[in-house]
């Protein structure tokens, strides 16, 4: 299925089931009113002694019925799905990038003599609505209590006085687009027939975070437990001076068997174990490093619950976030115990808002 490489069999099966169920329901609802089952539903209207009968069901004027359904469908598509906004914005020019985009090639970026290491953690589908209501979320009890505590006690970029975040713009609402937006300052806007092409994400003419750090002596490393080729992630990061370790790297290095496949590749518990190994190697290399990683357990549908975690909430997705929150907190605690921590900045960010209600 196009765009679904690396997805779990369960996720694909659920999507197919939802699609089939919706298709069956809509067709049943739309076709039933036109069928004659030997019974009619009518309305009798009396006026000035005359009686007129109107047949409601079955519908005889199929063309008129089809036109009404078409108008309703267009209205739904335009308002609920946002098609009208999409069409309107497609023909509108914006000065956003003209006014706010800064070309790194045109400014002087100065680094201190002792350069800070950077650990950049992209957390799949993680947003601040996961925290407790008292701090800006939507839950009575936070499903990411550790991340909530970290945000409260460290620097947090918010759009409110409470815990909040950024509003995603066009071209930043899926993983590779979000990673490009956060490391290059631009959205991923490609043609539909080019969306899965590696050429669409190369951005050879753009100076990115990886380029800036590499030119200043940093080692850039990207770790993920899925296939880096998916969505053009390998093309983008390898083109901008990152060494990449993904699912297939783990197979090649003998960390997992070639027939091992859990969720999107291998689960986050292994991801954090491998991250510790790579960080120790990078720290011992003697050069400043930028270690970027991407989690996956909290991807929809319903996320993945690691075997080390238990069900705390009634919703499966909430349990997935709660489990991921615990693993991230443990990982950060481990980092804080390392010698390189005092000279390291940690960035925790969701790649994009959740795709599941």
Question: What is each PLM-predicted segment?
Answer:
Residues 1-90:
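Transmembrane and membrane-interface helices of multi-pass
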Residues 91-110:
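Short extracytoplasmic/periplasmic juxtamembrane "stem" segments immediately C-terminal to an N-terminal membrane anchor
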Residues 44, 96-100, 150, 278:
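Residues that form generic nucleotide/phosphate-binding pockets
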Residues 56, 77-81, 85-91, 120, ...:
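Low-complexity, intrinsically disordered regions enriched in charged/polar residues
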Residues 84, 92, 96-98, 208, ...:
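A diffuse structural propensity rather than consistent per-protein peaks
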Residues 35, 39, 47, 64, ...:
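Arginine residue identity/basic-tract feature
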Residues 104-357:
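Solvent-exposed soluble domains appended to multi-pass membrane proteins
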């Amino acid at each position: 299925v196009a765009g679904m490489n690396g997805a779990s069999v369960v996720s694909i099966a659920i999507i197919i089931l939802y699609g089939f169920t919706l298709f069956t329901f809509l067709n049943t609802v739309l076709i039933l009113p036109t069928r004659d089952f030997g019974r009619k539903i009518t309305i009798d209207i009396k006026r000035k002694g005359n009686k007129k009968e109107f047949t409601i069901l079955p519908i005889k004027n199929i063309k008129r019925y089809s036109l009404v359904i078409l108008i309703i469908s267009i209205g739904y598509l335009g308002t609920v799905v946002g098609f009208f906004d999409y069409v309107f914005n497609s023909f509108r020019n914006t000065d956003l990038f003209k006014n706010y985009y800064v070309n790194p090639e045109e400014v002087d970026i100065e680094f201190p003599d002792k350069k800070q290491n950077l650990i950049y953690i992209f957390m799949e589908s993680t947003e601040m609505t996961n925290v407790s209501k008292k701090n800006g979320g939507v839950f009575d009890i936070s499903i990411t209590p550790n991340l909530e505590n970290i945000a409260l006690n460290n620097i947090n970029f918010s759009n409110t006085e409470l815990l909040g975040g950024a509003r995603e713009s066009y071209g930043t609402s899926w993983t590779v687009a979000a990673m490009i937006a956060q490391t290059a300052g631009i959205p991923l806007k490609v043609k539909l027939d080019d969306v899965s092409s590696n050429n669409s994400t190369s951005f050879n003419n753009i100076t990115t975070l990886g380029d800036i750090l590499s030119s200043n002596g940093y080692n850039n490393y990207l770790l993920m437990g899925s296939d880096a080729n998916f969505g053009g992630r390998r093309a983008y990061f390898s083109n901008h001076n990152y060494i990449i370790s993904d699912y297939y790297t783990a197979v090649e290095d003998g960390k997992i068997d070639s027939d091992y496949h859990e969720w999107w590749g291998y689960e986050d518990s292994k991801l954090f174990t491998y991250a510790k190994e790579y960080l120790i190697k990078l720290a011992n290399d003697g050069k400043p490093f930028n270690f970027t990683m991407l989690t996956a357990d909290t991807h929809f549908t319903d996320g993945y619950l690691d075997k080390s975690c238990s069900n705390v909430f009634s919703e499966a997705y909430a349990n997935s976030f709660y489990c991921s929150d615990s693993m991230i907190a443990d990982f950060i605690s481990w980092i804080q115990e390392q010698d390189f921590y005092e000279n390291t900045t940690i960035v925790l960010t969701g790649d994009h808002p959740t795709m599941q209600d």
